[in-house]
Amino acid sequence: MTTSPGVPEPSAQLLRLAAEVRQAAMALGQSDDNQRRKALMAMANALLSSSEQIVRANQLDLEKARTEGLASALMARLRLDESKLNSAIEGLRQLAQLTDPLGLRQLHRELDQDLVLERITVPLGVLGVIFEARPDAVIQITSLAIRSGNGALLKGGSEASHTNQAIIEALKNGLAETEIDPEAIALLKTRQESLALLRLDGLVDLIIPRGSNELVRFIQDNTRIPVLGHADGICHLYLDAAADLKQALQIAIDSKTQYPAACNSIETLLIHQSIAPSFLELAIPAFLQAGVRLLGDSASRALGVEESASEEDWATEYLDLILSVKVVPDLEGALDHIRRYSSRHTEAIVSNDQETAERFLQAVDSAGVFHNCSTRFADGFRYGFGAEVGISTQTLPPRGPVGLEGLVTYRYRLRGQGHIVADYANGECMFTHRDLPL
């Protein structure tokens, strides 16, 4: 996409900052595994030492957000208490222990004697990350960037300005004690800078938006830089005729209420008509007790769901304690609904019929398709990636939770001894194309 007239040209100051990040990123990309491991551990220690200041800064942001009437879903994302911060720090430490994503040989092939081709993983370069009320995203993204040898330009929402600044200062202080240049990461502070970031093709290699549907769509429509992300998280849970009702209820409650503001929480519950009466008899009181507002189709309303779901509801990412409920005739009815309304993020089935479950797993074209477990498992940390920069719902890779592997590209290296193409064109030499051990 070409940028729109509403996206400003980058200022001289922003161009200078981006160039500094890129220069530092070039050195970072040539650092070794041990240097980057030590950098992450130093970042974790700095966050721990600054935890009181970070939580205090977050309280300032929360108080301001309350007075401005910030939506409850955004308030939940904005909150960074000691427990949430400690979890992020632990994720950073785990990330330091993961296998180095750089320098991995993916292909090793002899083209001819003494003419050997390799494909090696290398950093992308500089990440441009734009996110809304998610201060923990600063920790996740900067740690993933450093571990994968990438620089990062970050712009958080103004509602988290105090928290973001406190976090980035701690992270830079940690890096200053290592061989990694703290200039590899930078925090943008104004909306004008975040818009102008979209014009930094040549200095930024990938844009990663984390926020509302509107934010992601705007970025996708207004930059020439590749964009990684998803615009919606409309996730579905289908309860099959062969579902264990107790298990189904536990999974449904967890998928909706464990963290309703997350993009991997369910927005629609699909129930096979044969179990709908017995399941809803159990589920409606449980959901109401958990504070969930239920919206249903005519069949589910006849079974006790009080409010009607509109056509718009099936296509809505609530990010709140609201759940649309629909009774379907069979698996095909569930699949039809998912094909029509899914954002291709994560869908799940509860069933003790293996054949039905396999059919669901094969037929649903989403980044994550689960059987007998909560959709909330769609997360880089829970997948063992250490952390994630976001979840991609695009078909081309990377797809799903994007961790270290999604932040590297590859380079072909060819080593020869004076080889020239003319010798192969005239038939004097022949290719061997022999694969060698990786």
UniProtKB/Swiss-Prot annotation:
Gene3D superfamilies associated with the record: Aldehyde Dehydrogenase, Chain A, domain 1, Aldehyde Dehydrogenase, Chain A, domain 2
Protein name according to UniProt: Gamma-glutamyl phosphate reductase
Pfam families for this protein: Aldedh
Natural source organism: Prochlorococcus marinus (strain MIT 9313)
Record keywords: Amino-acid biosynthesis, Cytoplasm, NADP, Oxidoreductase, Proline biosynthesis
Gene Ontology MF: a single term: NADP binding
Family, per entry: Belongs to the gamma-glutamyl phosphate reductase family.
SUPFAM superfamilies named among the record's database cross-references: ALDH-like
Keyword Hydrolase in record: no
